[in-house]
A protein has these predicted regions:
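N-terminal Rossmann-like FAD-binding beta1-loop-alpha1 element of flavoenzymes
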Residues: 4-31
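Glycine-rich FAD pyrophosphate-binding loop
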Residues: 23-47
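Dinucleotide-binding Rossmann-like beta1-alpha1 core, especially the glycine-rich loop
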Residues: 48-140
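Conserved flavin/dinucleotide-binding core of flavoenzymes
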Residues: 100-102, 317, 334-494
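Active-site/ligand-binding neighborhood in enzyme catalytic cores
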Residues: 125-229, 235-237
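Mid-domain catalytic core of redox enzymes
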Residues: 228-353, 359-366, 384, 469, ...
């Protein structure tokens, strides 16, 4: 059986970030990816001169500290991460309104009535008072507790309009959420961390997979290695060889679909929570199961429309994206004009538009043939971007059954206990760990997972030394508890 120091399962940005930080700390890693490329939900593809971002679309200039740390570490120049100059628009009452979520929208309206704008102002004031001191890395501590978006906005006509014309369109378009199923705390935490929906958004000039590709170039990554089970094993005996971190060999068994196995001293599962549940099976500790089970996902389904010409912004003030409220459509939740998002997304004189299926139809359409998905979603999108179908020369459907963390109320309730759990041989990474549905959430979780791996190894080594000196297990237990406390305390610093 092949033996490795730390096995990282999943070569999305969370797994690659974890591997990067572990290597920087002196550990040896091997990354196993079931697919044929790295990036996960940050994957991009190149088709006949078009550059398609299949999953994630943007990063932010503020609130993405962990991402920018990696960008600098791998040597991506800031000039290769341009600012997206156009903004977001809202489709309402038969037309697109610019400045959705941007302070300018208070003046222009952004599709809101005066009552809705007043509710927006009161919401901003509430964030500055009742939410003051709130740590976006700890959404479970929010004043809203586990209230859903719908519950949070109940009680007044103004708040209900704020939901209908801002919070619901943004959450459905960006996260694939339904307001009655997702908690408001993770959304507010995400927006507060970057400075609001009108933040300074950016993208990678060479595709959203840029950072993942650069990281993978520096790491041992094995593609086409689908993992089917991850099991903790009893550690080696007194005569076994401790690894670089002091953890004895044989700690984790990784089983692959082709029947092969790898033994690792420690492991990081950088996969969505539902998949982590499957991989751990009955081996999953009771203290981890509640949060993993509560960390449900929403599917994401979008159609890339390759155009024979660039369609113009739907608003006079340039907008590269249009969010569509549920009240206007339960089929199409939004569009992105990628040729306005960044240069190079389409060949000269051509265009590219991404059409997002709404969370009300995505589950139904996910398993349907491409032709039905395109016909259903793009026919509806024509209402919001006239000329789309006539300009389309080719379509590609991108499906993510496990699209983004749902931010369910149960996950908000269970997260504190999950963070306080002891470190173990198997740790986790993914934006679900941070309860922050974004690439920054994934990167931060990778850094946290690396810290917990190192803390566990340090605790095991200290416990072994203390146990040998004292002849008791109490010292080992104390060292492990200290390692867990240190790792949990690091959440707010990643």
């Amino acid at each position: 059986m092949v033996e490795v120091d730390v096995a990282v399962v999943g070569a999305g940005i969370a797994g690659l970030a974890a591997a990067h930080h572990l290597v920087a700390a002196g550990r040896s890693v091997r990354v196993f990816e079931g697919g044929d490329r790295v990036g996960g939900r940050m994957a991009s593809s190149r088709v006949d001169g078009w550059l398609l971002d299949e999953g994630a679309e943007t990063i932010a200039g503020a609130g993405y500290e962990a991402t920018w740390e990696l960008i600098r570490a791998v040597g991506v120049p800031e000039s290769e991460v341009p600012v997206i100059e156009p903004g977001f628009a809202l489709w309402r009452h038969g037309r697109a309104h610019p400045h959705l979520g941007h302070p300018k929208g208070l003046l222009t309206g952004a599709g809101l009535s005066w009552r809705g704008r007043w509710a927006w102002l009161r919401f901003v004031a509430e964030l500055g008072t009742a939410w003051r001191g709130f740590d976006p890395d700890r959404p479970e501590t929010a004043p809203s507790r586990d209230a859903t978006l719908s519950e949070f906005c109940a009680g007044s006509a103004g708040r209900q309009e704020l939901l209908a014309a801002m919070l619901q369109p943004l959450s459905s378009h960006c996260f694939g959420w339904r307001p009655e199923s997702s908690a408001v705390a993770p959304m507010v935490a995400t927006l507060l961390s970057v400075g609001g929906a009108g933040a300074r958004w950016m993208t990678y000039r060479d595709g959203m997979d840029t950072l993942a590709r650069r990281l993978a170039e520096r790491l041992p990554v094995e593609l086409g290695r689908r993992v089917v089970a991850v099991r903790e094993e009893a550690g080696g005996g007194p005569g076994s060889d401790p690894g670089p971190g002091g953890v004895r060999a044989g700690g984790v068994r990784v089983e692959f679909a082709d029947g092969t196995r790898v033994r690792a001293r420690q492991a990081v599962l950088a996969v969505p929570a539902p998949l982590a549940l499957e991989l751990r099976g009955d081996d999953l500790p009771d203290g981890e199961r509640p949060y993993l089970a509560a960390s449900t996902y929403t599917p994401m389904l979008k159609v890339a429309c390759l155009l024979d010409r660039p369609l113009p912004s739907p608003t006079r003030a340039p907008s590269y994206a249009v969010s569509v409220p549920e009240s206007e459509s339960r089929i199409c939740t939004g569009l992105i004009l990628d040729h306005l998002k960044a240069d190079g997304r389409a060949p000269a004189g051509k265009g590219l538009v991404s059409v997002f299926a709404s969370p009300w139809v995505s589950p139904e359409l996910l398993g349907e043939p491409d032709e039905r998905v395109v016909e259903t979603v793009c026919a509806e999108a024509e209402r919001f971007l006239p000329g789309l179908r006539a300009a389309t020369v080719r379509t590609l459907v991108h499906r993510f059954p496990l699209g983004l963390p749902q931010g369910a109320p149960a996950a908000v309730r269970e997260r504190a206990a999950f963070l306080a759990r002891p470190t173990r041989l198997v740790e986790y990474a993914g934006d679900w760990v941070m309860l922050r549905p974004s690439s920054e959430g994934a990167v931060r979780s990778g850094k946290l997972a690396a810290e917990r791996v190192l803390a566990h190894a340090a605790g095991a080594a200290a416990g072994a030394e203390a146990g040998a000196a004292s002849g008791t297990a109490a010292a080992a237990a104390a060292a492990a508890a200290a390692a867990a406390a240190a790792a949990s305390a690091s959440v707010g610093r990643v």
